[in-house]
Structures are given as structure tokens and as C-alpha cells.
């Protein structure tokens, strides 16, 4: 069945925004910690005359027989096969399909094989135009979003979130990051560093129509580097103090050089900071482009947060060029020694648009037998420098099991009783128990090796991540 755009001219439409997901753990889980911002942000930008729903495939079932007129699909590379499967099914049912997100930006020609229209880059500047064009039967194949000032960003549609998310108030105050880590797409996707007006951010924080007290109390900043603009963040934090919230975000370790900032973070209710530590090896840090990280300083920097009762979440990447199976397994002990409260453990994934991808292409190290579903942070998509792909996968899983063993979980929780304030201790304990339960029930990250779920899609549409055709590298 072909869709007929003329049907939609000059009338209100039903729009489904689907945040595409492929399960990353063996058994999945019914409750997730924090929702993505994209869907409820786009919903807030949608003209009021239209009816919009946001479906998070991470926690909700996608209805292929939806009554929606327009289907919007947003996805990362690891979820591209599922996005294309959904798009194919929706087009059979006569729906207008639109795709956007990081993967579409870096693989536009590929995406256009499955949808009617794509958004490249940031979507705010073209979002309203898309629906005007649908009404006029002039929908374009491509819309190029510009990196516009963040002065008119509305409060997200929190009312459209499903109940399965533990934290619900997700906020963005800034966009971009001044650093250029080799594995990160942010410098290309979100160029420059931009800030929203402080009062607009405070309006989001004041939104309080949530069921549970911790949802009304907690703010999760979905910023890539919230503290990069020091005058801005200090003013925001001063304004947040009277609101008496708990908040978490991501920042660079260089914040520990600024005691005034750390004190403001404490006074405004910070309970957790995520640092991208990535590695304990100098060669691996150089491979990651993490010039700002100094291994000898890790413990002292984390202590400065603990001295203020703030929890430290930290990301570690396995598979950088300096890594060996032994160094990866050793990270379980090393992250304990420096005082990390909640570790996040991933495998290097060379996404299109990153220097890692270009490097792997140039050295012929991308694995040519794998589809996009492997690009989810938990599978090996390239040939490592000092081990085989199988050795890297095993070392990562050994690290994961060790870091989330019951002994490690309760050591971290026990330490938090003496180093963290109440909100930080509670949040870090919940996160640790969340992952500890996974380890206890063998709910590990899925290894896609040997699985055929998306084989037919790969064969049909020739999704080849390593292809130079139509790629931005």
C-alpha cells in the first residue's frame, strides 16, 4: 500500500516519534534508569494542532498498525537494522516515514533507501517546515538542520514519557563539547558550544508533575559537558540552590581544578558526575584523544568530589590500541582503587563521523562481516591492536562480571556510606544494585556473534558499515 500525501493537506496529523532500540542485554529489563531526551524534545517542538505520541522501544512495544499518519524514527548506528525494518513495514502500510539522528547524519544515502525523508544534523531548524511541507504535498527527501542558538528551546513533553523510567526529568542546558575525543561524534553532530538561557533551564527544572518524590527531586542533565563554560554553569548553579534539587550530569575531569565550581555543585544539590576516564594506560588515552586525563591524578580528582559528598560515575573503554586482555581485566581492581562509585564498561565502537572510524578504515581494521547491530558498545566491530576480536570480547565480559560481582557491588555501596551525602549514596547504591542484579541473574550484554536476527535485512539491503560509499568519515 502506497501512502497518499494529499490526504494530509491542511489537516491535523497523528505523529508517532519512535526512539528505536535493539535489546542489549540477554534478558532485557522492565525498568530503565533514565529516558532519552530526543523524543519528548521533538514532541515539544511539534505544532500544537497535531497529535503526537512518543514511543521508546527500549521499554514499549512498537505497534506496526498504528493509526499515525507520520512515523518519525530516531536512532543510533547500533539500532539502524531495526529502524530500517520498522520503516519498511510502515511504508507497506502507507505511512509517511522520516528518519533522523546520528546514524542518518553520517549515512544519509543508506537511510534514504528506507524512508521518505531524512533530517541531517540538528532538527530544530527544520522540524516545523517538515510538517508544513507534508501539508502542502511538498515533502523533501533531505532536510539539513543548522546548529542554531538554543534561545527558544521549549520544555520537553515529560507527560509523554512511559512509566518504566526511574528518573523522568531530563534537561539539556548546553550543547557541544570543547574536546575532540577520537571515538566521539559530538564535535561533528553538535558543533561549537552553545548554552540555553538560564531561566529557560530553570523552567524545565521547576516542572514538577511527576508521580514519585524522587522524580520531582531529581534532575538529569543530558549535556555532553555541562561545565565547559565556567561563567554560565556557575550562574546556573547559583540559581539552582533555592530549588533544592538533586542533579547529575557529565563533565570533564578538569572541573576538579576549580574549587569554587565544586562548592557550587555541592551547594546546588549535585549527587553524581560522570567522567569519561576511559583507560589507565597512557597509550590508550592517546588513542582516545583524552589529553586532559592524567592517570596519576585520577584518585586525587575523585577524592575532591567525595570530599563534597558527590558520587563519581565513570566510563571505561575496552579495546583501545594500548589495551591487552590483561590490562582490561585489571581495570576491575584499578577502578576500585581510585574510588569510582559506579563504573560504565563499554567496548570501543568506531562510529561513522569519528576519527576512530577513519583510522580503522585507513588501516583496514573494520570487520567486514558484521552489520550495524554490532555497533552498540558491547560487541567487537574491528580488529584490535594487541589481541584478537574474540580475546577482546572475552576480556570485556570478564571485566564486566568482576566489576559487577556482589563483592564489588557491596564494597562500593559500603564505601559510599562514608564518602557520599544521602542523595548521592542512594543514587549510586541503586545504580550498583541495578547492574549487580544483572550479573547475578546472568543478564549480561548480548554478544551478537553467531546470531541471525538481522541477517536477512543485511543481505537484502546490503548494510555494510565499512563501505566507503556514502559515508562521512
Swiss-Prot record:
Annotated keywords: 4Fe-4S, Iron, Iron-sulfur, Metal-binding, Methyltransferase, S-adenosyl-L-methionine, Transferase
Q: Cite a single GO BP annotation.
A: methylation
Q: Which organism is it from?
A: Synechocystis sp. (strain ATCC 27184 / PCC 6803 / Kazusa)
> Any idea where the B12-binding domain is?
1-141
Residues that bind [4Fe-4S] cluster: 177, 181, 184
Matching InterPro entries? Cobalamin-bd, Elp3/MiaA/NifB-like_rSAM, Methyltransferase_Class_B, rSAM, rSAM_horseshoe, Tetrapyrrole_Bchl_Biosynth_MTs
Q: Which PANTHER family match?
A: ANAEROBIC MAGNESIUM-PROTOPORPHYRIN IX MONOMETHYL ESTER CYCLASE-RELATED, BLL1977 PROTEIN
Q: What is the lineage of its organism?
A: Bacteria, Bacillati, Cyanobacteriota, Cyanophyceae, Synechococcales
Family to which this protein belongs: Belongs to the methyltransferase superfamily.
User: SUPFAM superfamilies, from UniProt?
Assistant: Radical SAM enzymes
Query: What does this protein's record comment on cofactor binding?
Result: Binds 1 [4Fe-4S] cluster. The cluster is coordinated with 3 cysteines and an exchangeable S-adenosyl-L-methionine.
Q: Which SMART domains match?
A: Elp3
List required co-factors: [4Fe-4S] cluster
Protein name per the record: Uncharacterized methyltransferase slr0309
Amino acid at each position: 500500500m502506497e501512502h497518499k500525501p494529499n490526504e494530509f493537506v491542511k489537516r491535523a496529523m497523528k505523529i508517532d516519534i519512535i526512539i528505536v532500540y535493539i535489546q542489549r542485554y540477554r534478558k532485557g529489563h522492565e525498568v530503565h534508569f533514565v529516558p532519552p531526551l530526543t523524543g519528548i524534545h521533538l514532541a515539544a517542538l511539534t505544532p500544537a494542532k497535531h497529535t503526537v505520541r512518543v514511543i521508546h522501544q527500549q521499554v514499549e512495544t512498537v505497534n506496526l498498525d498504528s493509526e499515525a499518519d507520520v512515523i518519525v524514527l530516531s536512532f543510533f548506528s547500533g539500532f539502524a537494522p531495526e529502524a530500517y525494518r520498522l520503516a519498511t513495514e510502515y511504508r507497506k502500510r502507507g505511512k509517511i516515514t522520516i528518519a533522523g539522528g546520528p546514524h542518518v547524519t553520517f549515512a544519509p544515502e543508506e537511510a534514504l533507501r528506507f524512508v521518505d525523508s531524512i533530517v541531517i544534523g540538528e532538527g530544530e531548524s527544520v522540524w516545523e517546515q517538515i510538517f508544513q511541507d507534508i501539508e502542502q504535498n511538498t515533502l523533501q527527501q533531505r532536510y539539513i538542520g543548522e546548529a542554531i542558538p538554543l534561545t527558544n528551546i521549549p520544555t520537553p513533553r515529560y507527560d509523554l514519557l512511559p512509566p518504566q523510567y526511574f528518573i523522568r526529568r531530563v534537561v539539556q542546558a548546553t550543547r557541544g563539547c570543547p574536546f575532540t575525543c577520537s571515538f566521539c561524534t559530538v564535535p561533528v553532530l553538535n558543533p561549537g558550544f552553545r548554552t540555553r538561557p538560564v531561566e529557560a533551564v530553570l523552567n524545565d527544572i521547576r516542572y514538577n508533575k511527576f508521580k514519585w518524590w524522587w522524580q520531582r527531586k531529581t534532575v538529569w542533565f543530558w549535556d555532553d559537558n555541562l561545565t565547559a563554560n565556567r561563567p554560565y554553569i556557575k550562574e546556573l548553579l547559583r540559581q539552582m540552590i533555592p530549588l533544592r534539587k538533586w542533579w547529575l550530569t557529565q563533565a570533564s575531569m578538569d572541573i576538579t581544578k576549580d574549587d569554587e565550581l565544586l562548592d557550587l555543585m555541592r551547594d546546588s544539590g549535585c549527587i553524581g558526575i560522570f567522567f569519561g576516564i576511559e583507560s589507565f594506560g597512557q597509550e590508550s588515552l592517546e588513542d582516545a584523544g583524552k589529553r586532559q586525563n592524567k592517570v596519576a591524578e585520577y584518585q586525587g580528582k575523585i577524592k575532591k568530589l567525595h570530599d563534597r559528598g558527590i558520587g563519581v560515575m565513570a566510563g571505561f573503554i575496552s579495546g583501545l590500541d594500548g589495551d591487552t586482555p590483561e590490562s582490561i581485566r585489571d581495570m576491575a581492581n584499578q577502578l576500585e582503587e581510585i574510588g569510582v562509585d559506579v563504573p560504565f564498561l563499554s567496548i570501543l565502537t568506531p562510529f561513522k563521523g569519528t576519527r576512530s572510524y577513519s583510522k580503522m578504515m585507513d588501516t583496514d581494521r573494520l570487520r567486514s562481516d558484521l552489520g550495524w547491530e554490532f555497533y552498540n558498545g558491547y560487541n567487537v566491530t574491528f580488529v584490535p591492536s594487541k589481541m584478537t576480536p574474540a580475546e577482546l570480547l572475552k576480556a570485556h565480559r570478564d571485566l564486566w562480571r568482576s566489576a559487577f560481582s556482589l563483592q564489588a557491588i557491596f564494597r562500593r555501596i559500603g564505601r559510599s556510606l562514608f564518602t557520599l551525602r544521602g542523595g548521592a549514596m542512594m543514587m549510586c547504591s541503586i545504580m550498583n544494585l541495578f547492574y549487580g542484579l544483572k550479573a547475578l541473574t546472568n543478564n549480561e550484554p548480548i554478544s551478537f556473534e553467531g546470531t541471525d536476527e538481522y541477517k536477512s535485512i543485511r543481505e537484502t539491503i546490503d548494510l555494510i558499515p565499512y563501505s566507503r560509499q556514502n559515508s562521512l568519515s
